[in-house]
């Protein structure tokens, strides 16, 4: 008999929109659900829609002072120097007081944080912990339910790159990233994909709480390797843009020698790595200021144990 | 023998980038040409690349205080109340002092103003005056040179909608609008189209100055009819988004009864006009704040007389 993890039922779920104020699918859906909650209601579970960065939503910008999705580290969450805190750090502390505290037993069980990207990533789920069997099982369920539509999983576990995301205060933090969609735009096709992901996530939780056992599963994920910077000259000016052959090719293999950038005088700059990688977040608008042209990933397969709830209702 | 217009040679041409600071193709090209002018040089013509809204470019936003591309009316250009002027109105006066004055003999002959849109408009040329034979001839030349790639012409002459564009200070104002491209993003395909339009425009001017006669021509244009607003509830909240069937269908016919919007509860809102129209600027990010979901146009054909230069070099 295989190992089986017996887990507590899920009691509290939050759905975050507007962590980046110009990523409109989540803002629009969360505002809708705040008025019409029946779509996300599931028996015996508190499901709470919440706008995390109302200041940024109001201005339709990514953030007011700093990226809310990078400040949920212990230093910021504990900082009591109230006079000098940025809008987003104050907001992070407030969010942590409601849905956390991060790392504690009181934290929400699940946070689904809704994002858009200008990259052609399609429907994407973001996993923070490769040992989180519950979330891997959920992602497997969502992927299966979304088929034949592709639904990719990005694993952001990394020895050096730390994200300190808004959702990271939950026991099971889940990023939902759907693109391509320009900042400040609502596309019906993107909205529909995001909405279906949330439906399947909540259905999974409902089945789990009801006592359904989820058998051991495997999940193909793309694990973050590194960020690739734009070429710049001595003045710091960007000297090349994403090559046509790479544009819109998120999740497709990039081989050493493949075109990566194009300079304005027509010179191609090739990828010079020593192995095949799978780029993602290619040409994401918000990452120009971080000087990230794209993120490389490697494909790997995670295995999750069977899971079951302790106390079927 | 047909009529022929004999016109003065073109002496001064400006290429504007960054009128909207987050429309990056023009910003990137103009900054490139400021350092490497040989690509846009033509004998006997001053061709001046210029960043019109450096404050907005610096912040990668559409504008700092107000839309620079709507303030070139006589009231703003003459306003001397320096203390209370917005950044963009001050900038408009400065631009007018260099490239204008608007409506005077001293104004630049041609201004090519470079824009991007999140709409699927492809390569688009914007015409302000249906009687401007020189510009119609240029657009005909550009369209022919771009083929088989589509290059649409939008005519913004309208009894009620007035634009007061940045380029309107020139004798021949030319808008260049290429999409789809998200705000804050540079796409190689979009950059290439814009660059080819500028090459063909400058080649046309060069041929014209050299004494080449351009024979009478006809030009298919899409003339602005009206702007269509998003449906809103009593609180002013947007209640529907662009329908999937209309999204990305710029320049395609929209018939009475065709789907136009979709509400979050799945209801379709149909187009209820009384004739076929050709929508454009569908789901443009910058027009949410103007509450414009798209612009309707009608197809028409303009005729231009033959043109020739007075003094062939």
From Swiss-Prot, chains A, B:
Classification via InterPro entries: AspA/AstE_fam (IPR050178), Aspartoacylase (IPR016708), AstE_AspA_cat (IPR055438), Aste_AspA_hybrid_dom (IPR007036)
Main location: cytoplasm
Cofactor requirement: Zn(2+)
Entry's Gene Ontology molecular function annotations: aspartoacylase activity; hydrolase activity, acting on ester bonds; metal ion binding
EC number, UniProt record: 3.5.1.15
Gene3D superfamilies, per the entry: 2.20.25.160, Zn peptidases
GO CC field: cytoplasm; nucleus
Pfam families, A to Z: AstE_AspA_cat, AstE_AspA_hybrid
Enzyme class, UniProt record, top EC level: hydrolase
Positions annotated as active site in the UniProt record: 177
List of residues binding substrate: 62, 69-70, 163-167, 177, 287
Residues annotated for Zn(2+) binding in this entry: 20, 23, 115
Domain of life the protein comes from: Eukaryota
Protein localization: Cytoplasm; Nucleus
Coiled coil: none
Family: Belongs to the AspA/AstE family. Aspartoacylase subfamily.
NCBIfam families in UniProt: PRK02259.1
This protein's name: Aspartoacylase
Species: Xenopus tropicalis
């Amino acid at each position: 008999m295989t190992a089986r993890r017996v887990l507590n039922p899920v009691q509290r779920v939050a759905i975050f929109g507007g962590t980046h104020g110009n990523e409109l699918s989540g803002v629009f859906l969360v505002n809708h659900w705040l008025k019409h909650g029946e779509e996300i209601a599931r028996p015996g579970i508190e499901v709470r829609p919440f706008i995390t960065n109302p200041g940024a939503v109001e201005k339709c910008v990514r953030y007011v002072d700093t990226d809310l999705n990078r400040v949920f580290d212990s230093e910021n969450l504990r900082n009591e120097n109230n006079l000098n805190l940025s809008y987003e750090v104050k907001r992070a502390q407030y969010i942590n007081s409601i849905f956390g505290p991060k790392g504690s037993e009181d934290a929400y069980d699940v946070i689904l944080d809704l994002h858009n990207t200008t990259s052609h990533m399609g429907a994407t789920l973001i996993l923070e912990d490769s040992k989180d069997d519950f979330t891997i099982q959920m992602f497997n369920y969502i992927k299966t339910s979304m088929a034949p539509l592709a639904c990719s999983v990005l694993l952001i576990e990394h020895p050096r790159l730390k994200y300190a995301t808004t959702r990271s205060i939950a026991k099971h933090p889940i990023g939902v990233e759907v693109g391509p969609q320009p900042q400040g735009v609502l596309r019906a096709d993107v909205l529909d994909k995001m909405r279906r992901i949330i439906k399947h996530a909540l259905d999974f939780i409902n089945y789990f709480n009801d006592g359904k056992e989820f058998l051991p599963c495997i999940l193909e994920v793309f694990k973050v390797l590194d960020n690739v910077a734009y070429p710049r000259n001595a003045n710091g000016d960007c000297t090349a843009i994403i090559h046509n052959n790479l544009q819109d090719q998120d999740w497709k293999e990039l081989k050493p020698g493949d075109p990566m950038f194009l300079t304005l005088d027509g010179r191609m700059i090739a990828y010079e790595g020593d192995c095949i990688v799978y780029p993602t977040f290619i040409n994401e608008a918000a990452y120009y200021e971080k000087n990230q042209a794209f993120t490389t990933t490697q494909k790997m397969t995670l295995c999750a144990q069977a899971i079951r709830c302790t106390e079927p209702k």
